[in-house]
Amino acid sequence: MKTKQLTIVLTVVAIISASIFSSCRKKEKEEIDNDTAGASDQSLASSSVNDLTSISDEAAKTYTISSFKTAETNAILSSCATITFDTLAAAKTITVNFGATNCLGNDGRYRRGALKIAFTGKYRDSLTLITVTPQSYFVNDNQITGSKTIKNLGHNAANHLVYEINANISIIKASGGGTITWQSARQREWTAGESTLTWSDDIYSITGSANGTTSNGNTFTSVITSPLIRNMSIGCRRHFTQGLLQHTPGGKATRYIDFGNGACDSDATVTINGTNYNITLP
């Protein structure tokens, strides 16, 4: 009798255990993938790369050798940034020094350290190559290392200047937030403002792809599926105002990032497995 009771008890325990195990497995399968941190890291890295270009553009405007626009200054750079120009070196070099303490730019970002910008010719001349190298450089306390090159490819069929931009950078996030690595190959088309001397009427259309690792160590790839629009007017220049991008973290579903329809804000939408999540761009 005791043996039968023990058998019944063990059978019940086995059934309950199997039920619990099955329930746990079901919960694991139903776990919602809603992590947008990787998409935010991607946006931070992309924005940082574009910021390097914007600063090098503005710094060179001060000097006629570069054939940059000269009618408008201090679009991003404020009075705490010092610009020096070396004409004696074989490759002309501009250094933008923000100092050892945070320098607030006109775009609302804090910077310190320096950027070294070397160029082989005038910005508007075909095949001119510009190399931007950060030197103990921080933006909003995130350290940026590596380098970026900008090559003038001349005018396209629409008579717009096109630049090939390659970047290989790392971003060491503030407060021990991890490190983002980023390698990208993109093209930037100057779609508006080339014919004027006003920097804030410039608009750029950007295409291309990137790959790297997020701050939590996960690999990713990203592809621009609809050109990202960079509007350099006041209030717009900090973030992309339009465009679509596919961000695919290793082992997870693709994140579809929509930067909006042209509004000058820091809002974007990330779609994961058909569900939309609103994020604020860093």
Question: PLM features: residue spans?
Answer:
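Bacterial N-terminal signal peptides that target proteins for export
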Residues: 2-10
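C-terminal motif of bacterial Sec signal peptides marking the signal peptidase cleavage site
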Residues: 19-23
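Low-complexity, intrinsically disordered segments exposed to solvent
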Residues: 25-282
